[in-house]
Regions:
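Accessory, non-ATPase domains that flank or precede helicase/AAA+ motor cores in DNA-metabolism machines
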Residues: 1-146
Length: 146
């Protein structure tokens, strides 16, 4: 018999109120000592596996046969939320019609939040003039080249 993988229940930033619930994610062995309740993590979310920020609410083990996505990375060296703050966020969701993540967002300092952005660069040795010609009049493709 194999041990069940360690999991974390995570409130994700991308969830709306109607689908706001803790989502289960597998904890990779490399992150096992870093994933604790109250830390912020980056996880794949939705059908397109878009990376989004989440907050670990609790830890557990997976039921046999469950297919889970894995936590991509941990953003904090130590928890930014205490157990009391996590309970408060869950209570705020029920009382004030907001997501757990929105409640957490309101409790923590503004400079703490993580924002992802896509950065594109040309490969080394790529001819810039032929790239401009291939891009044509597309404003987005021209923006990537500039």
């Amino acid at each position: 018999m194999t041990d069940s993988p360690a999991t974390a229940k995570i409130a994700v930033a991308a969830a709306t109120y109607w689908v706001d619930r803790p989502f289960d994610y597998r904890i990779p062995p490399a992150l096992a000592d870093k994933v604790v309740p109250g830390v912020r993590v980056v996880v794949p979310f939705g059908g397109g596996n878009r990376r989004t920020e989440g907050i670990v609410l609790s830890l557990g083990t997976a039921q046999s046969g469950m297919r889970l996505k894995s936590i991509a990375s941990v953003l904090d060296a130590s928890p930014v939320l205490s157990p009391e703050m996590i309970r408060l966020a869950v209570w705020l969701r029920e009382r004030y019609f907001c997501t757990v993540y929105d409640a957490v967002h309101a409790m923590l300092p503004a400079g703490l939040w993580y924002q992802m952005e896509s950065v594109y660069t040309l490969c080394a040795g790529f001819d810039r003039e032929s790239a401009y010609a291939a891009a044509g009049k597309s404003a987005q493709e021209q923006l990537v080249l500039d």
